[in-house]
Swiss-Prot record:
One of its GO terms (molecular function) is ATP hydrolysis activity. Plays an essential role in the initiation and regulation of chromosomal replication. ATP-DnaA binds to the origin of replication (oriC) to initiate formation of the DNA replication initiation complex once per cell cycle. Binds the DnaA box (a 9 base pair repeat at the origin) and separates the double-stranded (ds)DNA. Forms a right-handed helical filament on oriC DNA; dsDNA binds to the exterior of the filament while single-stranded (ss)DNA is stabiized in the filament's interior. The lineage of its organism: Bacteria, Pseudomonadati, Pseudomonadota, Betaproteobacteria, Burkholderiales. Residues 1-78 are annotated as: Domain I, interacts with DnaA modulators. This is Chromosomal replication initiator protein DnaA. The gene is dnaA. InterPro entries: AAA+_ATPase, Chromosome_initiator_DnaA, Chromosome_initiator_DnaA-like, Chromosome_initiator_DnaA_CS, DnaA_C, DnaA_dom, DnaA_N_dom, DnaA_N_sf.
Length: 460
């Protein structure tokens, strides 16, 4: 039995991500194998249900290969834990497990990420935000790999590097991590981290003081420029012009530029086409919301930092219902702790439901692209299948464009993701639809009314 489990675990460790293996396979315990039946114990109901649906077939296949006979795999709750369900025992078990959570499962909230003190002689890099402290999972592994490559070869790999995604997903952490590594490798490099709003203010100040020569001299002399939330440049033509000059100067000198945004470059409203084409000349990488395993690890580790312990059941309950970003998880944890302490109650699923009832009700109403497609199809009396088809008559094409527009406005999906959900269409098709419907809405009261009705229907 021991030999089988070692072989099975080794195989699964190769096939899964470290987060998946640590969260789902490592906690399992093989109980016995008799008459072609293999019994495996899970530490709680959440892990039991998830492993049965996600990994049962693979474990069954490995077992059949090992014993060379058909094998039935049964998953059960760990008998030892079932027999010892006292709260004190639970706290001890969770505390022990929390120590096994990797130390990099939390994304610290930078204390100076939006500090706008005008001190240009400092890099403004947050030393707490490093690659070691970064949360790693499937959602951000490509962005992290690109960031490490840039940190190791600034100015020669992926220039510019453009990271985009929703708030609280780790973009700011990654660009600070790059800055920290570059500084560690060469303390003499000239680095500047700046939020886009502060850059705009610097442009305004230079204009008021007639100091554009000093402004250009400073920004053009940097070795590494880190611009956060560049979508704030939208509609600000003078700021974009100055940034274009800085961009050209730095790229020509083989200096590194790293940019973050909450949206895909071509989706940034009011951005000069020249800049968008420059952004596209480097590497553009999406940072996605964290997957379930990462969210659980974040909650457990953060709870330990707060001096409390979560049962696995509670952590999985919260992680399954809150899916958007790390900051949302941290905010939810603070609400749970405050509610628990105020009412003098232990943290249970029922307490979590009470503490987060407003947040959970919003999550339960979360809008999906599939729901948008069905609602729009019903509204215009067409088939849902028409949303994915290649048909192009006006009575189908326009509802499809409206559905794409609503998907962009009401969900966190990127343009490529929306295109994939509309029959594998290219992201440029989605972008055209979004811009067209947005323009029509501004000009046509009838279009605006239709969209308003659809939005209210979807939001309930």
């Amino acid at each position: 039995m021991e030999n089988f489990w070692q072989a099975c675990s080794a195989q699964l460790e190769q096939e899964l991500t470290p987060q998946q293996y640590s969260a789902w396979i490592k906690p399992l315990t093989p109980l016995d194998y008799e008459d072609g039946t293999l019994r495996i114990a899970a530490p709680n109901r959440f892990k039991l249900d998830w492993v049965k649906t996600q990994f049962a077939s693979r474990i069954t296949s490995i077992a059949a290969q090992f014993w060379e006979v058909p094998v039935e795999v049964q998953f059960v709750l760990d008998p030892r834990l079932v027999a010892a369900r006292r709260p004190a025992a639970q706290a001890s078990v969770v505390s022990d497990r929390a120590d096994d959570v990797p130390s990099n499962v939390l994304e610290p909230i930078p204390s100076n990420a939006t500090d706008h003190t005008p001190r240009r002689d400092q890099s403004r890099i947050n030393t707490a935000l490093t690659f070691d402290s970064f949360v790693t999972g499937k959602a951000n592994q490509l962005a992290r790999a690109a960031a490490i490559q840039v940190a190791n070869n600034p100015g020669s790999s992926y220039n510019p590097l453009f990271l985009y995604g929703g708030v609280g997903l780790g973009k700011t952490h990654l660009i600070h991590a790059i800055g920290n590594q570059v500084l560690a490798d060469n303390p003499n490099v000239k680095i500047r981290y700046i939020h886009a709003e502060q850059y705009v203010r610097d442009v305004v100040t230079a204009y008021q003081r007639k100091g554009f020569d000093d402004f250009k001299r400073y920004y053009h002399s940097l070795d590494l420029l880190l611009i956060d939330d560049i979508q704030f440049f939208g509609g600000k033509s003078r700021t974009q012009e100055e940034f274009f000059y800085a961009f050209e100067a730095l790229i020509a000198a083989k200096k590194q530029i790293i940019i973050t945004s909450d949206t895909y470059p071509k989706e940034i409203t009011g951005m000069d086409d020249r800049l968008i084409s420059r952004f596209d000349s480097g590497l553009t990488v999406a940072v996605e919301p964290p997957e379930l395993e990462m969210r659980v690890a974040i909650l457990l580790k953060k709870a330990v930092q707060e001096g409390v312990t979560f049962s696995d059941d509670v952590a999985f309950f919260v992680a399954k219902h809150l899916r958007s970003n790390v900051r949302e998880l941290e905010g939810a944890l603070r609400k749970i702790l405050a509610y628990s302490r105020f009412h003098g109650k232990d943290i249970t699923i029922e307490v979590v439901k009470d503490a987060l009832k407003d947040l959970l009700s919003v999550q339960n109403r979360q809008i999906s692209v599939e729901n948008i497609q069905k609602t729009v199809a019903d509204f215009f009396n067409i088939k849902v299948a028409d949303m994915y088809s290649k048909k192009r008559p006006a009575n189908i094409a326009r509802p499809r464009q409206i559905a794409m527009y609503l998907a962009k406005e009401l969900t966190q999906k990127s343009l490529p993701e929306i295109g994939e959900l509309f029959g594998g269409r290219d992201h440029t098709t989605v972008l055209h639809a979004v811009r067209k419907i947005a323009a029509d809405r501004g000009k046509s009261p009838e279009c605006n009314h239709e969209l308003h009705v659809l939005e209210q229907t979807l939001k309930g």
